């Protein structure tokens, strides 16, 4: 144990994973951090391995993926691990954010950790989109064309930026090379942001707890107590991931992507990966192209205003019944947006999308501060009574 406390690198590991004290009352909702770290590790290892066999060219990208699947030893396993862990990564991130919403993890002194977390989410979406383009199937090509074309909504310079990103007048070899290079490098930037996120949590007030109260006294070391608690969910997660990888590896993908990219034939519906669907629904719900793009980016950036719009006296929603109802309605609305993002742009889905988009933004800007003020008023009245 002495080397753990004297070695310059190992003592950091010791401070964060062994000796760091945690509140005694945190539950399994606090296990998402370790699972997300595991997902990031799997993605980097499998991604680097896949990069050794991938060829980023219009002529060979699709064939190189087939080569990985058929000819590389356990290539099918590496590829399916990479694609399914990406979905698991986003699923766990959404749960992690939901826990942060419910227990007020965005409030001081953890505001910096929350803002870094939002930046991580935005970067993850960019990395996920870049990766979706690389197999160069039908959905890869047309997804890349549609999403990059959104930048053309920027007045005057938009089209020039799009052509600069493409390296030509359409998606071509230069585009694939750029996307591959960025998709390879950005996960390491993501890992650096994750370390910053961890430092922001640990150097401010440490982990929060379900009561939302400062837990400076009733604490226990991370190892062995929470280390074994994390291992339980890690084993359960690996079991669940294995079911997807071995028995239904393509259930979360799109069958169109098993057709080689054809610039002369547009798919019946251009749908991104499931984890981008809520924001795609917000984009499509606004008829104006520029306003739709602004709304889509605003729907992510608006997460950063939560520390200012939650005006409640108490931290978290566990003792605030009206805020709980508003939160569950928000979650339902988010799941509805996820469904609407996969639908065709036709009535009644357009109208439902517009209502859901309005409710999404209203939760942050109107419902949350309004309900907080109402609850504060009721608390004041009960104290005076």
From Swiss-Prot:
Q: Name one GO cellular component term.
A: respiratory chain complex III
* A Gene Ontology biological process term: mitochondrial electron transport, ubiquinol to cytochrome c
Q: Pfam families from the entry?
A: Cytochrom_B_C, Cytochrome_B
The molecular function terms in GO held by this entry are: metal ion binding; ubiquinol-cytochrome-c reductase activity
Question: Matching CDD domains, A to Z?
Answer: cytochrome_b_C, Cytochrome_b_N
- Cofactor-binding details, from the entry: Binds 2 heme b groups non-covalently.
Q: What is its main location?
A: mitochondrion
Q: Which UniProt keywords apply?
A: Electron transport, Heme, Iron, Membrane, Metal-binding, Mitochondrion, Mitochondrion inner membrane, Respiratory chain, Transmembrane, Transmembrane helix, Transport, Ubiquinone
Q: Which residues bind heme b b562?
A: 82, 183
Give a yes or no for keyword Mitochondrion in this entry.
Answer: yes
> Which amino acids does the record list as binding a ubiquinone?
202
Q: Which cofactor does it need?
A: heme b
Please give the InterPro entries that the UniProt record associates with this protein.
Cyt_b/b6_C, Cyt_b/b6_C_sf, Cyt_b/b6_N, Cytb/b6-like_sf, Cytochrome_b, Cytochrome_b_C_euk/bac, Cytochrome_b_N_euk/bac, Di-haem_cyt_TM
The region annotated as signal peptide is none
Q: Mind telling me which residue stretches traverse the membrane in this protein?
A: 32-52, 76-98, 113-133, 179-199, 226-246, 290-310, 322-342, 349-369
The yes or no answer to whether the keyword Glycoprotein is present is no
Residues involved in heme b b566 binding = 96, 197
Q: Which family does it belong to?
A: Belongs to the cytochrome b family.
Q: How does it assemble?
A: Fungal cytochrome b-c1 complex contains 10 subunits; 3 respiratory subunits, 2 core proteins and 5 low-molecular weight proteins. Cytochrome b-c1 complex is a homodimer.
Give the protein's biological function: Component of the ubiquinol-cytochrome c reductase complex (complex III or cytochrome b-c1 complex) that is part of the mitochondrial respiratory chain. The b-c1 complex mediates electron transfer from ubiquinol to cytochrome c. Contributes to the generation of a proton gradient across the mitochondrial membrane that is then used for ATP synthesis.
Q: What is this protein called?
A: Cytochrome b
Q: What species is given as this protein's source? A: Akanthomyces muscarius (Entomopathogenic fungus)
